[in-house]
């Protein structure tokens, strides 16, 4: 969300859901104004779901190259939130596709500017498969803290 960037840039180690050229340029501008370099992850819509944000896999390389060319941002890798899995192993192929995309991006030099080292994918229900497919970060909030309470309507 563009309106929250002014609160994030320089206050978090990494912005993990960057999915457009516009966001990259806004982060770069804010980071330069602060005299810092902001680490980012490019969010990939690996499942092609209309309900999820993220770029198409074929758009990733151009965004990483753009970020690598700007002084205020450093692309560190990729992140994805997989489709909801209703059975164990259901997202294994999705994680394998993300791993291959990560390997492809990591293999590019981008003028030796970047250190692509983060593959963020997998959640409480499928993190083991994500790790087996190369994830370096997982989201396991539900496993640690339990399910979020259902939304309540105040009345």
Please report, for each region that a protein language model flagged, where it lies by residue.
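C-terminal helical cap(s) of enzyme catalytic domains, especially alpha/beta-barrels
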Residues: 131-155
């Amino acid at each position: 969300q563009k309106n929250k960037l002014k609160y994030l840039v320089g206050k978090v180690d990494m912005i993990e859901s960057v999915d457009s050229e516009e966001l990259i340029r806004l982060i770069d501008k804010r980071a330069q104004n602060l005299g810092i370099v902001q680490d980012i992850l490019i969010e990939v819509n690996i499942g092609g779901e209309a309900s999820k944000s993220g770029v198409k896999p074929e758009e990733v390389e151009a965004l990483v190259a753009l970020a690598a060319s700007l002084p205020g941002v450093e692309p560190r890798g990729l992140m994805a939130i997989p489709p909801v899995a209703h059975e164990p192993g259901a997202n294994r192929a999705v994680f394998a596709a993300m791993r291959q995309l990560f390997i492809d991006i990591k293999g590019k030099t981008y003028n030796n500017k970047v250190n692509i080292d983060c593959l963020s994918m997998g959640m409480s229900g499928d993190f083991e498969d994500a790790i087996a497919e190369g994830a370096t970060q997982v989201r396991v909030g539900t496993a640690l803290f339990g399910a979020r309470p259902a939304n309540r309507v105040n009345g």
